[in-house]
Design a protein with these regions (language model features):
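N-terminal binding-site loop/beta-alpha segment at the start of enzyme catalytic domains
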Residues: 1-75, 110, 143
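A cross-family glycoside hydrolase active-site/sugar-binding cleft signature
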Residues: 21-23, 49-51, 74-76, 115-118, ...
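Glycine/proline-rich, positively charged
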Residues: 31, 42, 87-211
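Short hydrophobic/aromatic-enriched beta-strand-loop microsegments
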Residues: 70-75, 168-177, 271-278
């Protein structure tokens, strides 16, 4: 396992490049959750993202008992849980505070390594977190040593840059995979794709670490049928791709079962040839014509829709990502605001029929 140093951390804060995410593990038997965490630690994994169902915290706490100093926990302020332990998105200070204290208790610890502003995708959302006092709360917790580092998760480069501008951030969680980073070529080398790489370079330069979510695009890149490229990549290729991006310290693929963990652990023994992802250089715009790759070349939308983000949440929801579906419901402007003006379709380099997509997206979420 390769370990990378947190730029703004002390010399002991080194993460294995392979971590774990628990977004879909909430329905897994608690004994299996404990076994997964223990086996992961035994194999050198020491970074765990705790955006997950409430039922996950206690078994994780039991698994790390006696080994707390060996692991790093990334906890999200704004991810909360209902009476059944199901994940929810929240912007109420009292609920966020209560949830965090409960998480500490369940985990059996008196501190977390990273306290994250959770899923901040719009400027108005960041404004809200400041307004209700969550950012100040994180600063207080850091001063007390209860939160070691402040970070955030986002899907939006412009918002991410604004949060980094505060000077408070040591870690950012961002989705990175070949599908999200695809662009047609020099003619279209502007907008969202360039913004993403500029953001990653900024993080590298300023010492903000990146933890990577969605390295497999919710599993879609692993299937020729579902991949936007029409060709399957492997777990090893996707993980190496994410780890090679500027500023990245750790990739956190989601696991739900011991079999999932075993598959991910194969990365540690994979050869350079097995990790080689140069095949993506052969993918062309024709390969993905008709598929939204969230490049946002269609922007600005006259109705104010973030078309790339709306499509991303929709595709992830279709792939079974309930957290992404929940995030969609919190957007300030959703698919139902579409004016059917065709502006986006005129600008789309991939010939995506976004007007009909907006109708389908609205209908899909209305039925959930």
């Amino acid at each position: 396992m390769e370990y990378r140093q947190l730029p703004h951390g002390n010399e002991t804060e080194k993460f294995g490049v392979l971590g774990l995410g628990f977004g879909g593990i909430g329905t897994t038997p608690v004994d299996e959750i404990e076994a997964i965490v223990r086996k992961a630690i035994d194999h050198g994994i020491n970074f765990f993202d705790m955006c997950t169902a409430g039922a996950t915290y206690a078994p994780v706490g039991r698994a790390i008992a006696g080994r707390r100093e060996q692991v790093f926990l990334q906890v999200h302020f704004g991810a909360v849980y209902d009476e059944n332990g199901e994940y929810g998105w929240c912007r109420d200070f009292d609920t966020i505070q209560k949830t965090f204290l409960w998480e500490l208790e369940q985990l059996g610890t008196d501190y977390v390594d990273f306290g994250f502003l959770h899923c901040v995708d719009e400027d108005e959302d960041f404004d809200k977190l400041i307004e209700i006092g969550v950012l100040d709360y994180l600063k207080e917790l850091k001063a007390q040593g209860i939160v070691r580092h402040i970070g955030f998760s986002s899907h939006t480069p412009s918002v991410a840059n604004r949060i980094i501008d505060t000077g408070l951030i040591d870690m950012m969680m961002f989705s990175i995979n070949p599908a999200y980073d695809f662009e047609k070529g020099d003619e279209y080398g502007i907008g969202s794709v360039k913004e993403r790489f500029d953001l990653f370079r900024r993080c590298e330069t300023e010492g903000v670490g990146i933890s990577v979510m969605k390295p497999f695009f919710a599993g879609q890149l692993l299937s020729a049928e579902h991949s936007p490229f029409g060709q399957a990549l492997t777990h090893n290729q996707c993980l190496q791709y994410a780890i090679d991006r500027p500023g990245v310290l750790v990739a956190v693929p989601g696991v739900q079962t011991m079999e999932h963990l075993d598959q991910v652990l194969k990365f540690l023994e994979a050869t350079d040839e097995e990790k080689d992802y140069s095949v993506i250089g052969t993918f062309t715009a024709d390969t993905i014509t008709g598929t939204c790759v969230y490049c946002n070349h269609c922007q600005p939308c006259p109705a104010g829709i973030d078309i790339g983000l709306v499509n991303k949440y929709y595709d992830l929801a279709l792939a079974g990502d309930d957290i992404a579906a929940n995030h969609y419901t919190k957007l300030g402007v959703k698919a139902d605001a579409c004016l059917q003006c065709g502006h986006c379709e005129e600008r789309c380099p991939f010939s995506v029929k976004q007007m009909s997509r907006m109708v389908a997206i609205d209908e899909y979420f209305a039925k959930r």
